[in-house]
C-alpha cells in the first residue's frame, strides 16, 4: 500500500441527510462517486453468498473514511442465504455496520413486490416489512420493469425520509430500445413525483451493455431528464465492464458500482482501484480516498482464502453471456446446483437453451426471473438427457434453434411432429413459470408469449388459463395477509412470542426462518464470533484452539481429544478457558436408505431434484394418510433454486401413503405419495 496523506473532509454523503440533500450533493459533484458492492453483490456473484459478517466488518473502518456514495451490504439473496447457511440475521448485520461505519449510507437491494423473497407479497406485508428495516438507500428493481409493482416500497421509503433508488433492469434485445427504456423512466419519474428525491439505477445484471449501447442509453435519458442522477450497476462477465463504465460516466452517469480488486473474479464487478485510475487517466475525477481504498483491498487478502471452496467451477470471463444473459448473481448458485445434481457437463447446452428461451418468453433474467429461467431450461435439458442421453440434449437444442432462428418463431412453419414436441416442451415446467404466464408477478415487458407456450404449459386447460391471466399488479390483485394469525402461528411453532425481527424473517422465508431461530437458540452468537475456518470446519486435531470475544469477555476453546464412537455417542474432551469439560455428542451412524421410485399410475414422483418444504397446501394445511384430495389440488411443494414447484393430484383420490417428510431432499422420480382413486 502506498504511503499517501489522507484526504480531509472526504465524506460526500452520510446517514441523516435528506434525499434532497443527497441528490443535490451528488448532482453538484465534479466527476463521479462510487458504491462499493464488496459487502453484498461481490459475494453473491462469485462466492455463493458465503462471505460472513465476521470478515466483512473488517472493511468497515476503511469504508467509513473512503468517501463512498454508499455500501451495498444488505438484501438480494444475501438475506436468504444469511439465515439459511451463514446463520446470520440481516438485522444483526445492519446493527454491526451502523456502529463501525457511521459515515456510510447503507444500501439494500429489494425486488419490489417480491421484497427479499421470490414471490409477490401482499401490500400490507410489504408496508409492514419495509417500515421496520433501518436502511438508507433502497435500490428497488422489477424483473419485468413493471413500475406499478414498486409503488408500495416507494411510498413507505419516501415517507420515512430515506432515499429511494428505482432501478431499470437492462438487457440487449431487439425490443429493448431507447424508446422502451424512456417509457420505463417516465413511469418511474411519475411514480416518484419528479427527479429531486431519487437516484435512477441502470441494472446491467448480466454485463451485456456494450460500450456504445450504454452510453447511448444514458445520453438519451439525460437529454430527457437532465437533472436526474444516474447510477450504473454493471457486472464484468463479458470482459468489457471497465470501458462500459467509462462510457456511462462520459454520457452523464454520476455513480458507478465497484468492489475490492482482491474480490474480483469473473461474475461480479470492476475493481475499485483500477476504475479510479482508469477514469482519472481519461479525464474524469473520482471522489475517493485512494489510501483507504488500498487498505480495504489489502484487508480482503487476509481472509479471502477461506472462501476458495465457494468459487464457481466455471472459470473465466464469458462473452457468450451476451446471448444467454445469465446474471452474475445467479452463476454461482446455478453451478452449485448443477454440481450437486451431477449435470455440470450439460451447462453449455443449458446456456444455449436459455439464449433461445429468452426470445420466446421475454423478461429480464434477474431474481426471481433468473431462477425461473434456470429451473425451466435446466429442467428441459435434463429431461431430454434422462430420456435420450446426449443425443436428446443435442436434439432439443437443435429443435429450439430451428424454431427461433430459422423459422422466426412461426409455429405453423414447423413440421407436425416438431409442433407436437414443442407443445410438450413446458409441460413439466415449474409452478413459478406458470405463475409468470398467468400474470401473478405482473405484466411482461413487451406482452404475453404466443398461445403455443400456454398450450405447452397447461395442456387442454390453456384457453381457460389465458382467460384467468391477470393484468393487474400483484399489489392490486393480492388480498392482505392476516399478520396477527401468522405471528401467532410462529409463536406456537417456536414456543414463545417471536421478536419483531424474527417475525419479519418468518414473513420472508417461513421454513428457513424457523430453522434459523432454532439454530440460534441452541448455538447463540457462534456465527458472529467464530473465525471462518473454525466456523466451517471446526477444531479437527488435538491441540487445535480458537480464541474469541463474546459480549466483551475473552474465551478460549481447545480440543483435547475425541473418543471412540459407542452406540452412536462420542465423548469429546475440550478445554474451555482452561477448564476441562467432557461433552457427549450424538453421531447417528449413517444408514443406507433405499430410495423408492414412482413406477405406477397411482404413485406420484418428484418432477425435479429439490427439497420438500410443504406437504399439503396453504388452504387446507398439512395432508396425511386417509385424506381425500381432488384433481388439480396441490398436495406438496418442492423447492429448487428458490423456486416453488407444486405437486398436483392427478385425479380425485385418497392418500394411501406419504413417503417423504418435511425438509427431505428428493431426487427426480422419487416416490412422494401413493394414492388410490375415489
Protein language model regions, located:
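N-terminal capping/small domains of soluble enzymes
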Residues: 1-121, 125, 132
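Hydrophobic faces of well-ordered beta-strands that scaffold small-molecule active sites
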Residues: 34-39, 69-73, 104-112, 136-139, ...
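Terminal or standalone catalytic/regulatory effector modules within metabolic enzymes
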Residues: 36-44, 58, 62-82, 313-321, ...
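Active-site-proximal beta-alpha loop/turn segments in soluble metabolic enzymes
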Residues: 40-46, 79, 166-176, 198-210, ...
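Structural recognition of alpha->loop->beta junctions
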Residues: 61-68, 124-138, 182-202, 247-256
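Active-site beta->alpha loop and helix N-cap motifs at the rims of alpha/beta catalytic domains
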Residues: 75-186, 206-209
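Catalytic alpha/beta core domains of metabolic enzymes, predominantly
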Residues: 205-398, 415
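Structured functional modules or segments
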Residues: 595-678
Amino acid at each position: 500500500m502506498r504511503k499517501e496523506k489522507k484526504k480531509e473532509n472526504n465524506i460526500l454523503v452520510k446517514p441523516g441527510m435528506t434525499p434532497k440533500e443527497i441528490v443535490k450533493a451528488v448532482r453538484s459533484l465534479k466527476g463521479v462517486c462510487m458504491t462499493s458492492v464488496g459487502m453484498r453483490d461481490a459475494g453473491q456473484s462469485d462466492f455463493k453468498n458465503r462471505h460472513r459478517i465476521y470478515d466483512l466488518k473488517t472493511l468497515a473502518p476503511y469504508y467509513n473514511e473512503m468517501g463512498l456514495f454508499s455500501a451495498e451490504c444488505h438484501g438480494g439473496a444475501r438475506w436468504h442465504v444469511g439465515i439459511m447457511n451463514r446463520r446470520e440475521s440481516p438485522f444483526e448485520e445492519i446493527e454491526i455496520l451502523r456502529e463501525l461505519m457511521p459515515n456510510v449510507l447503507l444500501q439494500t437491494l429489494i425486488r419490489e413486490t417480491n421484497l427479499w423473497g421470490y414471490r409477490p407479497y401482499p401490500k400490507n406485508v410489504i408496508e409492514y416489512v419495509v417500515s421496520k428495516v433501518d436502511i438508507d438507500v433502497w435500490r428497488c428493481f422489477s424483473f419485468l420493469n413493471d413500475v406499478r409493482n414498486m409503488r408500495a416500497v416507494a411510498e413507505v421509503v419516501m415517507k420515512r425520509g430515506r432515499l429511494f433508488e428505482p432501478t431499470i433492469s437492462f438487457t440487449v434485445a431487439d425490443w429493448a430500445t431507447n424508446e422502451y427504456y424512456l417509457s420505463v423512466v417516465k413511469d418511474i419519474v411519475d411514480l416518484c413525483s419528479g427527479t429531486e428525491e431519487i437516484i435512477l439505477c441502470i441494472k446491467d445484471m448480466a454485463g451485456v451493455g456494450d460500450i456504445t449501447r450504454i452510453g447511448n442509453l444514458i445520453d438519451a435519458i439525460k437529454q430527457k431528464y437532465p437533472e436526474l442522477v444516474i447510477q450504473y450497476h454493471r457486472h464484468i462477465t463479458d470482459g468489457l465492464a471497465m470501458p462500459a463504465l467509462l462510457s456511462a460516466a462520459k454520457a452523464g452517469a454520476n455513480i458507478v458500482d465497484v468492489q475490492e480488486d482482491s474480490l474480483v473474479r469473473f461474475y461480479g464487478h470492476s475493481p475499485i482501484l483500477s476504475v479510479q485510475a482508469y477514469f482519472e487517466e481519461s479525464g474524469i475525477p473520482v471522489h475517493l480516498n485512494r489510501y483507504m481504498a488500498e487498505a480495504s483491498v489489502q484487508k480482503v487478502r487476509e481472509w479471502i482464502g477461506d472462501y476458495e471452496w465457494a468459487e464457481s467451477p466455471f472459470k473465466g470471463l464469458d462473452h457468450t453471456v451476451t446471448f444467454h444473459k445469465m446474471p452474475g448473481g445467479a452463476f454461482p448458485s446455478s453451478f452449485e446446483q448443477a454440481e450437486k445434481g451431477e449435470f455440470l457437463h450439460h451447462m453449455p447446452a443449458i446456456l444455449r437453451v436459455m439464449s433461445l428461451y429468452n426470445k420466446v418468453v421475454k423478461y429480464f433474467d434477474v431474481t426471481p426471473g433468473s431462477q425461473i429461467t434456470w429451473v425451466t431450461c435446466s429442467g428441459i435439458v435434463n429431461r431430454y438427457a434422462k430420456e435420450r442421453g446426449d443425443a436428446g440434449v443435442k436434439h432439443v437444442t437443435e429443435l429450439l434453434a430451428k424454431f427461433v432462428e430459422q423459422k422466426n418463431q412461426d409455429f405453423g412453419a414447423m413440421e407436425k411432429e416438431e409442433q407436437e414436441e414443442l407443445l410438450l416442451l413446458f409441460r413439466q415446467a415449474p409452478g413459478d413459470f406458470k405463475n409468470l404466464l398467468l400474470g401473478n408477478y405482473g405484466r411482461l415487458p413487451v406482452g404475453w408469449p404466443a398461445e403455443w407456450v400456454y398450450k405447452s404449459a397447461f395442456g387442454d386447460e390453456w384457453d381457460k388459463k389465458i382467460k384467468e391471466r391477470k393484468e393487474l399488479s400483484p399489489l392490486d390483485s393480492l388480498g392482505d395477509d392476516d399478520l396477527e394469525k401468522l405471528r401467532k402461528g410462529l409463536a406456537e411453532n417456536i414456543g414463545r412470542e417471536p421478536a419483531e425481527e424474527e417475525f419479519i424473517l418468518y414473513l420472508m422465508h417461513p421454513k428457513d426462518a424457523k430453522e434459523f431461530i432454532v439454530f440460534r437458540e441452541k448455538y447463540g452468537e457462534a456465527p458472529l464470533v467464530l473465525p471462518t475456518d473454525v466456523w466451517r470446519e471446526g477444531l479437527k486435531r488435538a491441540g487445535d484452539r480458537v480464541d474469541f470475544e463474546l459480549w466483551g469477555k475473552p474465551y478460549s476453546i481447545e480440543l483435547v481429544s475425541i473418543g471412540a464412537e459407542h452406540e452412536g455417542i462420542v465423548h469429546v474432551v475440550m478445554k474451555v478457558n482452561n477448564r476441562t469439560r467432557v461433552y457427549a455428542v450424538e453421531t447417528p451412524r449413517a444408514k443406507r436408505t433405499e430410495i423408492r421410485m414412482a413406477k405406477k399410475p397411482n404413485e406420484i414422483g418428484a418432477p425435479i431434484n429439490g427439497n420438500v418444504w410443504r406437504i399439503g397446501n396453504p388452504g387446507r394445511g398439512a395432508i396425511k394418510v386417509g385424506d381425500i384430495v381432488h384433481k388439480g389440488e396441490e398436495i406438496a411443494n418442492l423447492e429448487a433454486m428458490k423456486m416453488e414447484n407444486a405437486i398436483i393430484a392427478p385425479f380425485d383420490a385418497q392418500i394411501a401413503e406419504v413417503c417423504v417428510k418435511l425438509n427431505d431432499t428428493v431426487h427426480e422420480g422419487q416416490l412422494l405419495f401413493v394414492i388410490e382413486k375415489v
